[in-house]
Regions:
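NTP-dependent small-molecule kinase module
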Residues: 8, 151-163, 167-227
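Hydrophobic anchor at the beta1->P-loop junction of P-loop NTPases
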Residues: 21
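P-loop (Walker A) phosphate-binding loop of NTP-binding proteins
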Residues: 24
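Conserved lysine of the Walker
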Residues: 29
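Post-Walker A alpha-helix
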Residues: 32-33
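Conserved substrate/cofactor phosphate-moiety recognition/catalytic segment
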Residues: 38-76
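Glycine-rich phosphate-binding loop used to anchor ATP phosphates in small-molecule kinases
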Residues: 65-134
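A glycine- and Lys/Arg-enriched "phosphate-lid" helix/loop adjacent to the NTP-binding pocket
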Residues: 103-177
Length: 227
């Protein structure tokens, strides 16, 4: 077990615990959110695509519908975030609102699916919305190599993920690394998940729970891989 600690001041804190889970596709966000919520009896909120009215159109024509999709996600996540913040219970959210702007809309713009004009308009609206939200207490970043992510995605075989490539995952991974180097809204707990089975190994989950409960004052990386 190897812990690397690097202190960096975070933003202000809310009177209650609000934790957001971030990470690439297939990193294990939903699994961790479910288990932390169950273990600590916290409110949980999950990323959902079932009722998203823009997804079918988006997958049919990404260039035409990328802006609409990102605006929908912004409103949905802001509403989800505020509901969690109003709830007196501690809460953990599957996917942060920040990733939409700094990772996914940026990727759409980079690949030519989101026009410059639309991208700038979206980022301006994003800044206005996020500026009105209180900062979370902690961001948990799940870090995982691209080859492991790809294997997990292929194993779970979701229809909407059939077009995901290692090139796309690598692009997202590079954006995550760049974003987190500058992120100072709240403390960040980075967890390597390529060899950390908190689904089937109770002790691994307990280690993560313990670190989250400490309400970190800086940045810490957990690496539970065998040496």
């Amino acid at each position: 077990m190897n812990f690397v600690y690097n202190r960096k001041n975070g933003g202000g804190h809310m009177p209650k615990r609000l934790v957001v889970v971030a990470g690439n596709i297939g990193a294990g966000k939903t699994s961790l959110t479910e288990r932390i919520g169950s273990r600590l009896d916290w409110r949980t909120d999950f990323e959902t695509v079932a009722n998203n009215p823009y997804l079918p159109d988006f997958y049919a024509d990404m260039r035409a519908w990328s802006f609409h999709l990102q605006i929908y996600f912004l409103g949905h996540r802001a509403d989800q975030y505020l509901e969690a913040a109003r709830d007196p219970r501690p809460a953990i959210l599957d996917r942060s609102i920040y990733e939409d702007a700094y990772i996914f809309s940026r990727a759409l713009h980079h690949m030519g699916n989101l026009a410059e004009r639309d991208y700038l308009a979206y980022r301006k609206l994003f800044d206005l919305v996020v500026g009105s939200l209180p900062p979370p207490n902690l961001l948990v970043y799940l870090k995982c190599p691209v080859d492991v992510l790809m294997a997990r995605i292929q194993r779970r075989a979701r229809n909407m993920e059939t077009g995901i490539s290692t090139t796309y995952l690598s692009l997202l991974d590079s954006f995550y690394e760049e974003w987190l180097r500058a992120f100072d809204i709240c403390p960040v707990l980075t967890i390597r998940t390529d060899d950390l089975d908190y689904v089937n190994q109770p002790m691994a989950l307990e280690v993560v729970v313990a670190r989250i409960q400490e309400r970190l004052g800086g940045k810490e990386e957990i690496d539970l891989r065998s040496k």
